[in-house]
Curated annotation (Swiss-Prot):
It comes from Thermococcus onnurineus (strain NA1). Its EC number is 2.1.1.-. Specifically dimethylates two adjacent adenosines in the loop of a conserved hairpin near the 3'-end of 16S rRNA in the 30S particle. May play a critical role in biogenesis of 30S subunits. One of its GO terms (cellular component) is cytoplasm. GO terms for molecular function: RNA binding; rRNA (adenine-N6,N6-)-dimethyltransferase activity. The gene is rsmA. It is an enzyme of class 2 (transferase). The keyword Coiled coil does not apply. InterPro entries: KsgA/Erm, rRNA_Ade_diMease-like_C, rRNA_Ade_Mease_Trfase_CS, rRNA_Ade_methylase_Trfase_N, rRNA_adenine_dimethylase, SAM-dependent_MTases_sf. Belongs to the class I-like SAM-binding methyltransferase superfamily. rRNA adenine N(6)-methyltransferase family. RsmA subfamily. This is Probable ribosomal RNA small subunit methyltransferase A. It is found in: Cytoplasm. Its main location: cytoplasm. Keywords: Cytoplasm, Methyltransferase, RNA-binding, rRNA processing, S-adenosyl-L-methionine, Transferase.
Amino acid sequence: MRERLFSLISKYGLRANSDLGQNFLIVDDIIERNVERAELSGRDVVLEIGPGLGVLTDALSKRAGKVYAIEKDPRLVEILRKEYNWSNVEIIEGDALKVDFPEFNKIVSNLPYQISSPITFRFLGYGFERAVLIYQLEFAQRMVARPGDRNYSRLSLMVQAKSYVELVERIGRGAFYPRPKVDSAVIVLEPKPKSEVIELNEDLVRALFQHRRSTVAAALKKSHHMLGLSKAEFKNVKDVISSAPYAEKRVFQLSPEEVKEIEAYLKVNNII
């Protein structure tokens, strides 16, 4: 796989586009482990974001029934279509944050790091069975952080409200070409059953985590405009907010269940 990638780079005189976050994974063992982690069979339809020069795509094509690979760089799209003769791979040229996703049940990707947050939230809006994703290490650590941890954030809360998430492998920067400035990590995501999913008001979550080190009451007061409250309206409900569940708890200590309780209280009191 590694030899194939460098052969294509040499053949086409390619330089990675840093604006598109292009860092090609060059360690065969990591590629193989991620394909194994996806638990693929012939019935699976895989979505890959940023196939690059097709090294992971090729491995996926041998295990899955169908692979959809979304690539933004027209140079790479042309190379993929010219160099590979896949019968079960469809290359889609476009921006993964904007194009319509085809139907799929699994995701396997070495993600462009600059779209990590928006693409992850987009994934969470789809019903998939399993995702194996490479992220920047710091981002991956935030995804798995628990309430009270230093890295716990809005991302941690929203991901864990809807899915089981596990950091399964740390990857050094030498595993990529060109070499990035940061280490990476492999995350495995599995959506929770509907009965366990906690649907949260996103405006409330943003308002709270805008001031993650503050208490719940203080955060809501500072961010009342994010809840659609005018200054006059806020004055009328200030005392109600002070009596919210977990009012004196720090925002970064809140579990999804506790945020749901706060949401229910604010709804009952017609604040959101």
